[in-house]
């Protein structure tokens, strides 16, 4: 997964793609936290970037839910 995904890139994805991206990010965050607890994590910054990515995905989904933004095909999803 790319580091530092922009909100613009996320807005181009469909709801299904966002849900898949969210699942992958949550799984990665779980693994990073496990590595941190066992002392195997070298890059602590990655925890923050993954959490920010999850927040961005939730924000895009919420914008669509409230009708503040549309899906990538121009229709409301």
Swiss-Prot record:
Stretches that traverse the bilayer: none
Pfam families recorded: Ribosomal_L29
Keyword DNA-binding: no
InterPro entries: Ribosomal_protein_uL29, Ribosomal_uL29, Ribosomal_uL29_CS, Ribosomal_uL29_sf
Keyword list, A-Z: Ribonucleoprotein, Ribosomal protein
GO molecular function, one term: structural constituent of ribosome
UniProt keyword Ribosomal protein present: yes
Coiled-coil portions: none
GO (cellular component) term, any one: cytosolic large ribosomal subunit
GO BP terms in the entry: translation
Record family assignment: Belongs to the universal ribosomal protein uL29 family.
NCBIfam families given in the database record: L29
Protein name: Large ribosomal subunit protein uL29
């Amino acid at each position: 997964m790319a580091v530092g995904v922009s909100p613009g890139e996320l807005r181009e994805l469909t709801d299904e793609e966002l849900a898949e991206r969210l699942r992958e990010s949550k799984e990665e965050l779980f693994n990073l936290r496990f590595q941190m607890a066992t002392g195997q994590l070298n890059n602590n910054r990655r925890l923050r970037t993954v959490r920010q990515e999850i927040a961005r995905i939730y924000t895009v989904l919420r914008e669509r839910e409230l009708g503040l933004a549309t899906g990538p095909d121009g229709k409301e999803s």
